[in-house]
């Protein structure tokens, strides 16, 4: 079950209110998906992180309990694609060892938000009961790294089944 996984002690289904104040949540800049405002993404600012450099959560727009539908942890690899891919491979191997019968899909795609076509992600998606887990290596192109100060990073993303369906059917249509 995807809810058994944690990113910095936070799981799918938890309330973000257990970790930060309502005021902090409401004052955060929200990132919406291109085709729908049903869900939004915010950076979670906890006191400190043990494993990740950044943590991002996905919340439902009309939910005043701030239930977490998605959570991602990112480890910066400081514009080093080789390190990024190596770390992604290591995490993938660990997950396959933990779940030898789990189905997964490897893919690579170009990020559409980078008009230069230089930025890409190499991903492995594991399909779990009630959700999905993705391991990304985000390889940002040189132009985006300079203009947006983007960093290559390894990202572990947990999505509830509800969020997974939303992303696959409505978020980018």
For the regions a language model picked out, list residue spans one by one:
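Compositionally biased P/S/T/G-rich terminal and signal peptide-adjacent segments
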Residues: 42-67
